[in-house]
Amino acid sequence: MSYVFVNDSSQTNVPLLQACIDGDFTYSKRLLESGFDPNIRDSRGRTGLHLAAARGNVDICQLLHKFGADPLATDYQGNTALHLCGHVDTIQFLVSNGLKIDICNHQGATPLVLAKRRGVNKDVIRLLESLEEQEVKGFNRGTHSKLETMQTAESESAMESHSLLNPNLQQGEGVLSSFRTTWQEFVEDLGFWRVLLLILVIALLSLGIAYYVSGVLPFVDNQPGLVH
């Protein structure tokens, strides 16, 4: 069975709904252009989109959507148009326009559950199963991404609080970073061996100044020997 039979909707006194049941695209378009409400319902709360989707008439579904039909509308049992679908192209159209594949009616049944009960063809079942699997994977990825975002925000907040509580530390890190950058630029400009030679000359000058001031050579034991 490829669509849902609705006993009290097989004949209706609402022209637009009857046109959707009959699959009459031309008459449906004429009625919509004349101002008919695209969301008008039958006695069970079904809209034209429900009835067209149940019969796999994707052209009328697209027409109704163009004129403002609500793809999320539910009947009095909580069924969306997707719950009544039994055709691949109609399912793809509804899902691409915002209907969730895992949405439940008032009895807790998803479109996949109802499709299996109706015994629709295997291609439709496989499509619904694939869409449900993608929905679950997307939810898991979204949850993981949100957790990572929260953890990053908490880490940044903690670092900011630490910096506010320790302004001297933040200032010291800035000075150290500036000194390191300046030293690297100095070494690159002068050359490693020249810098090494300069350090050696400075060290020797320091030793000479120390001897001149104190009269004592550094690193030399200048204690007077014992007089015998």
UniProtKB/Swiss-Prot annotation:
PROSITE patterns, alphabetized: ANK_REP_REGION (PS50297), ANK_REPEAT (PS50088)
Membrane-topology descriptor = Single-pass membrane protein
Keyword Zinc on entry: no
Q: What is this protein called?
A: Ankyrin repeat domain-containing protein 46
Q: Does the keyword Membrane apply?
A: yes
The UniProt keyword set, sorted, is: ANK repeat, Membrane, Repeat, Transmembrane, Transmembrane helix
Please name the Pfam families in this protein's record: Ank_2
InterPro entries under this entry?
A: Ankyrin_rpt, Ankyrin_rpt-contain_sf
Its chief place of residence is: membrane
Localization annotation: Membrane
Cellular component, GO annotation: membrane
Q: Where are its TM segments located? A: 195-215
Map the ANK repeats onto residue numbers. 11-40, 44-74, 77-103, 107-138
PANTHER family listed in its UniProt record: ANKYRIN REPEAT DOMAIN-CONTAINING PROTEIN 39, ANKYRIN REPEAT DOMAIN-CONTAINING PROTEIN 39-RELATED
Q: Which SUPFAM superfamilies match?
A: Ankyrin repeat
